Curated annotation (Swiss-Prot):
Pfam families tied to this protein: NYD-SP28
Chief subcellular location: cytoplasm
Subunit structure as annotated in this protein's UniProt entry: Component of the nexin-dynein regulatory complex (N-DRC). Interacts with DRC1.
Protein name: Dynein regulatory complex subunit 2
Lineage: Eukaryota, Metazoa, Chordata, Craniata, Vertebrata
Family: Belongs to the DRC2 family.
Gene that encodes it: CCDC65
Organism of this sequence: Macaca fascicularis
Length: 484
């Protein structure tokens, strides 16, 4: 011990004191952290224990509270079920009575339906017979009109063809006569030209023959003189010179005579040219006449073409009218066939819909007008003011359809009323389904129900739902409407 005290009293250095102080701080920090960990663990355990105890207590409270609420809700539901059972029994009794009355009405309606069906079939047979008779009359009238039109067309066609043939023969005769006149005039002009040509030719030949004879005589004289001169030339030169001079003079005379003869020939040629000019003039005149004749011929041919075109147009128009007539007749037959098919379809639909008619409709199929006599007279006066003659004639043919349109309008009104009633019943059904859903949600427990407003959650005797609609208690005298 003394040794220890001695050691303790030994002085420590600064470093050792610093280390010792740091160790103390570390130990203190570790102790503080350990205390914090222990304290947090203690608090967590205590919190978990408290949560467990609170959940257990809450479950116990909910279990006990649910039993109390179920008992209260059970009593309320028993009361509601008793009321609903009473109303259901009353409704069932009413339905039974209605079924019995409907069965009785059904038997009576079947008897009336049989009677009405027999009368309706009889009337339908009469209408069909009337319609067939009308169709036969229409077909006969159509056939008669068609036959008359075909006869008229054939007669008109025959007259047009005869007229055309007559005109063709007439034009051919005119053409042949004009051609014969042209041939005759041409032949006469040729004869005249040939006669003039022969006359001129004969005159020319005569003048040539005369000149030739005259010139031959002159040449013979000259030849004789030349022989004499030649003979004399042989005799003496002087005589030849004198003879040469005389011959020269004679030559001049002969040249003058030749010039005179040439002038005559020129005159003859001028006469020939004049005659040729006359011939040309006659030929031009004949050409003009021929041109006029050709123009007349062309005009006649143009008229012939026009007549042919008119004939073809008339033939095409008649053929077009015939085709149009056949098409219209076929369209009329198809329209009549469609009307007959539509009538048969309407009759079939009437037979099918007859089983849906009520007893009143079978007994009185055509309802009387709901208008007063004054209102009916006012409507008729307004209709008469607005109607035209053609529309009045058309309406007379359809007076038998008034009863049909009455029944059609009645069925249309009943259809609209049933659609309106169906919409009302669907609305009531939706409301009842909503109420039933709310009721089932009130007696069932699920996550969806718990997430919504629920009458089971009651605090201080107050629910989180609004007050439910009070179910009316039916009395024996009240009328019950059937629900769908």
């Amino acid at each position: 011990m003394p040794k220890k005290e001695k050691k303790a009293k030994t002085p420590l250095s600064d470093e050792e004191q610093l280390l010792l102080f740091q160790q103390k701080l570390l130990t203190e920090e570790e102790m503080a952290k350990k205390k914090e960990r222990l304290l947090s663990q203690f608090l967590k355990d205590k919190l978990a224990k408290e949560e467990h105890n609170s959940a257990l207590n809450l479950n116990k409270i909910n279990t006990q509270w649910r039993t109390v609420l179920r008992e209260v809700k059970t009593r309320e539901l028993h009361k509601d079920i008793e009321i609903l059972s009473q109303t259901f029994e009353r409704v069932v009794d009413c339905k039974d009575n209605v079924i019995k009355s409907l069965a009785k009405d059904l038997s009576e309606a079947e008897e009336q339906y049989a009677r009405a069906l027999r009368s309706h079939l009889h009337s339908v047979d009469q209408l069909l017979a009337l319609q067939r008779h009308r169709l036969s009359l229409l077909e006969e009238s159509y056939n008669m009109e068609l036959e008359a039109l075909t006869k008229e067309f054939e007669t008109e066609r025959k007259t047009i063809i005869d007229q055309h043939e007559k005109e063709i023969h007439y034009l051919q005769d005119i053409f042949m006569a004009m051609e014969q006149n042209y041939i005759d005039s041409e032949y006469e002009s040729k004869l005249e030209f040939q006669s003039m040509w022969n006359d001129l030719k004969n005159m020319n030949l005569e003048e040539k023959h005369f000149l030739r004879l005259h010139l031959e005589n002159i040449v013979e004289d000259l030849w004789r003189k030349f022989q004499d001169v030649l003979k004399n030339y042989t005799d003496a030169t002087e005589d030849r010179k004198a003879a040469f001079e005389t011959l020269q003079v004679k030559d001049e005379k002969s040249s003058k005579e030749i010039e005179v003869q040439m002038k005559k020939i020129q005159k003859l040629q001028d006469a020939i040219t004049i005659s040729k000019g006359k011939i040309m003039i006659h030929s031009r005149e004949s050409e003009d006449e021929n041109r006029y004749i050709r123009n007349d011929k062309e005009l006649v041919l143009v008229q012939l073409r026009k007549l042919k075109a008119q004939r073809t147009q008339a033939r095409a128009a008649s053929q077009k009218n015939l085709v149009k007539l056949t098409l219209e007749s076929n369209a009329t037959l198809k329209a009549l066939r469609k009307i007959v098919d539509k009538g048969e379809k309407i009759l079939k639909l009437a037979e099918i819909c007859r089983k849906f008619e009520t007893e009143e409709e079978k007994v009185l199929p055509f309802y009387s007008s709901v208008l007063t006599p004054k209102e009916q007279e006012g409507i008729e006066e307004n209709n008469l003011e607005e109607l035209t003659e053609e529309l009045a004639k058309v309406m007379v043919d359809y007076t038998g359809m008034e009863n049909f349109w009455k029944r059609y309008n009645k069925v249309k009104l009943e259809q609209l009323s049933l659609q309106h009633r169906r919409a009302q019943l669907l609305d009531i059904n939706g409301k009842l389904r909503e109420m039933l859903k709310q009721y089932l949600d009130g007696i069932s427990v699920s996550d969806e129900v718990l997430s919504q407003l629920n009458p089971l959650f009651i605090v201080n005797y107050q629910s989180n739902l609004p007050q439910p609609l009070s179910i009316p208690i039916a009395h024996p005298g009240d009328k019950q409407h059937p629900t769908t």
